[in-house]
Amino acid sequence: MRFRSRHQVDKPNVIVTQSNRKNEDRLGEDASLKAAQAMFKKHTVSQGFAVSDAPGTKLSLPNSGHGTPAHNVQAMARSSSSSSATSTPINIIRRSPRSSLKGKPMGGLSVSPRTVEGNAALSQQAAAVALENEISGDESIVLVPAGNSNGSMTRSNSSINAIRIVPGGGLSSSRSSSKVSIVKNSPTHSLALADKLNSITLESVYGKPSTATGTATRTLAGRKAPPAAFIDQDSVLSNDKHSENEDTPIKGTISYDTTARMNVPVTYEGTLPDLIPGHQRHKKKKWRNIFGSSATHGSSAGGAIGINGTSASGNDQYENPSGTLSELQLNRAEDNLIVKSVNPTQKTRLQTTLRSNDYDRNSELAAVAGGYSSDESAFSSDSDRELHYATDNHHNNSINNHSSGVYYGNVGGNGVYNGGTAGVGRTKHRAMVRSHKRKSFNEDKPWKSHVDIGYISERERKRYEGIWVTNRNSYLELLPWWNQPLQDEEQEQEQEREMDHESQHGLEEELEEEREQESGQGQEQDADIPEDGLMLNLIVMEIWSRSNLSNQLLGQIYDKVDTRHDGTLNRQSFLTGMWLVDQCLYGRKLPKQIDQRVWDSVDKFVISIPNNNPHHRHRRRKKMLRKELKTIKKDLKT
């Protein structure tokens, strides 16, 4: 840092380096307070102030949170003695490098301490406020004396001396309000405070964990120390017990961004650097707006996890880049910074697949149960990509489920997308989906696609008639009685030739009588042959045998439908026989006698008419009558 006097306007008072380190703790502030006290001591001594440890004054600095931004920092000092000394006003000017470059006006605060001891205490308080702004890198505070125009506070012993910091005109600050109280106690407290400050070095307290809850920790490793000339002049810093060459390990949540900004080479032992910083989504997902986000999701999405296992809350989860729980050790001899992992078993696991497993969840739970936690698992895989992939799948599945009626339920709080780590703890439950598609005809199980109506349907009759038309009137000449009329005609012609020589008168009369008799018999045979034709019994058995039924069963069917008894079947018999073969294939028994409506359904159209008194109702009536008769008989006997 470079310093200037109050009268110089061209040069800035304090040059604060801008940094993104947000890991701070209370002990780090107390250690840096010592350097700030020495800095303000140099300024206040030249103006007639004594900046030293005030006897009877105890200084406590609560940690300043970053949850809600504010612009005012108040410090309250209560006097316990009845001193009526005159007050000397002091101006603490809060200056920002940005505002000084742009020429913006700066705000100030007025301090009216009661006594010289009060001035020293308030100087320490101003140093704490200056250190707070120095760490943030946004603004700086300079303590200068002011005239009486700013106003002096003259009140009773119970009055309150307030320090009020007003930011420069229009300058927006993102620091939150922190209240610092100054309580005057016995001199033993001030001595204990002085011993405590003298025993603490700047480097030995940077890495100590913070005891405050709900705020993110901030490491001071890598921050430039004050100039050596200034440290030599300071009596407090020169009397440190620990030497500068002593290497003190620092434990804390350290990110790769922090180590990359250091001007020393870094050696990683036992772990890999976090090459993937904490990614912040620009907009939330729709399902997160509806169902919200849980703590486990916040930690996996880049939330900061402290050393004691508590996760950071508020907006710091997305603002703080998480790091690996590591131990820093500065080797001054070799000018090298060594980064070691606290837990040797913790190793960076890189993502190899988009499939989710239970290993990530189990390791995270084991780490929390063991009292330590690491954000290494959050960067071992691209959690943002997994969440994006999972949310896209969930959106597509929800659309398909609305159309198909499939419901995904929740079991044990782990639903389809619970508020946990991406790809962990999900259970999908699919309901049984039954398709209503019409199945094709199964030849092995034909009875499943058949409805028994007790007669030949129109569809079945058309199928049977197609077979009849293609095979009728075939091979009928094999029958013994089919060619007999032709042979009789040839014999008659031969007899006529022999009887030519005989007398024509007597013989003609006899021949006419014989011809009349033969013609009558031929007409009777022609009348027996139907117009639809006939089918030979050999062809019938060949067609029916393709059903793989036994020959005995096929013979029984043929005997039931044969009405001619001459080795042929007419149309009605053939269609009825085909229907009986199908009924046997459907698994039904062969009836003893064929119903008349089956014969009628071959040549006629069957129309189904609803029956008002079906057969099963008649049976019920008979049973009811029998029960009534039994009850009547019992009544008569009694």
Curated annotation (Swiss-Prot):
| Entry keywords, A to Z | Lipid metabolism
Q: Where is the composition biased (Basic and acidic residues)?
A: 494-508
The reply on keyword Mitochondrion is no
Q: Where is this region: Disordered?
A: 292-315, 487-529
| Gene Ontology biological process terms, A to Z | lipid metabolic process
Function, in words: Positive regulator of phosphatidylinositol 4,5-bisphosphate turnover and negatively regulates signaling through the cell integrity pathway. Involved in rDNA silencing.
Write the protein's name.
Increased rDNA silencing protein 4
Q: Which organism is it from?
A: Kluyveromyces lactis (strain ATCC 8585 / CBS 2359 / DSM 70799 / NBRC 1267 / NRRL Y-1140 / WM37)
Gene behind the chain = IRS4
